């Protein structure tokens, strides 16, 4: 879900897929009272041999590109609209990328383009993340796309231990006997669960990956593993402050087969204010002990005034309106929350 505030009337976007009705990008111009679900052009070319199953990410472009909206799909694909999301066209430079052959299946099935991050002032620069396929950047308006996650190498002891144990049960990993793009280290991160760009410092990127939390200060050319100090290397969401204070937030999860739950039965948001050099555990107002819910990759966001909002698989939303240490549960219980978007307008 996302909100486009570039016009006088904010436009809400919601996306997904249905086994009978297919993929869609729904639009609402009346705060969600009514929706238009038509998504003309949201399909791969026939000769590609792939069918869009669902839409995982919607991202309105920056103010200097009125009308432009991007959509990321499963199977992994990028689509662009130039009429505020009314009609769509495939971005062939991504969808036919020469390294598409290395985009493997993820836990949810086919590869997924789940993250679209835009430079706040440079329309030629944007990032995309593909599940089990890496993160890519373009700096020339989409003409070419270069992988930028291949320099993210985990150094945290927790991940190294997991890798060693996994290699025992899956020998190809022990021998590094699996296909990777040319010139890419087999131990490089190819699974950024969520990548965020600091809009107040656009050279700084943050990523919660399958194997740790990483930070880049040069637009993805180099990455530092900043997992040390967290109770787990694993997790899905990551959120970045939009106020310029440099804060980032994660929700560490246990890594036990498919049982991705909060660590040690205590729901906690962890915050760093020093570029990942240290982390603070925030539990005030959050459930536990004996709490075993989880948070999906799109389940946490920040607003322009320092608010932090996190939604859970148990249907609860917790908010810190000004980024302080305490969170308050908002009224109501929803179905499992797959996306949280925080916008003040």
Question: Could you tell me what each predicted segment is?
Answer:
Residues 1-345:
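Extracellular glycan-interacting surfaces
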């Amino acid at each position: 879900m996302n909100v486009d505030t570039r016009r006088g009337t904010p436009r809400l976007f919601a996306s997904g897929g249905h086994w009978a009705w297919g993929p869609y990008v729904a639009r609402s111009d009346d705060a969600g009272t009514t929706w238009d679900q038509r998504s003309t052009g949201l399909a791969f070319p026939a000769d590609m041999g792939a069918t869009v199953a669902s839409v995982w990410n919607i991202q309105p472009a920056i103010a200097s590109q009125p009308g432009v909206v991007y959509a990321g799909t499963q199977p992994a694909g990028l689509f662009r609209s130039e009429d505020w999301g009314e009609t769509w066209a495939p971005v062939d430079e991504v969808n036919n990328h020469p390294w598409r052959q290395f985009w493997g299946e993820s836990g949810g099935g086919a590869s997924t383009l789940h993250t679209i991050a835009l430079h706040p002032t440079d329309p030629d620069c944007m990032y995309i993340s593909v599940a089990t396929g890496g993160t890519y950047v373009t700096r020339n308006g989409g003409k070419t796309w270069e992988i930028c996650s291949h320099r993210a190498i985990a150094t945290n002891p927790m991940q190294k231990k997991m890798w060693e144990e996994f290699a025992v049960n899956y020998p190809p990993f022990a021998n590094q006997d699996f296909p990777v793009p040319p010139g890419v280290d087999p131990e490089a991160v190819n699974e950024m669960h969520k990548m965020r760009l600091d809009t107040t410092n656009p050279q700084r990127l943050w990523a919660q990956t399958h194997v740790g939390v990483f930070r880049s200060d040069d637009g993805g050319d180099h990455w530092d593993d900043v997992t040390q100090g967290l109770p787990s290397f694993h997790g899905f969401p990551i959120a970045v402050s939009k106020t310029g204070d440099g804060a980032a937030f994660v929700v560490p999860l246990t890594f036990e087969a498919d049982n991705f739950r909060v660590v040690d039965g205590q729901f906690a948001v962890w915050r760093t204010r020093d570029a990942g050099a240290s982390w603070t555990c925030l539990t005030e107002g959050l459930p536990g002990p004996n709490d075993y819910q989880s948070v999906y990759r799109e389940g946490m966001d920040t607003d322009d005034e320092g608010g932090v909002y996190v939604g859970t698989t148990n249907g609860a939303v917790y908010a810190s309106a000004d980024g302080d240490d305490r969170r308050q549960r908002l009224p109501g219980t929803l179905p499992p929350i797959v996306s949280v978007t925080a916008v003040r307008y």
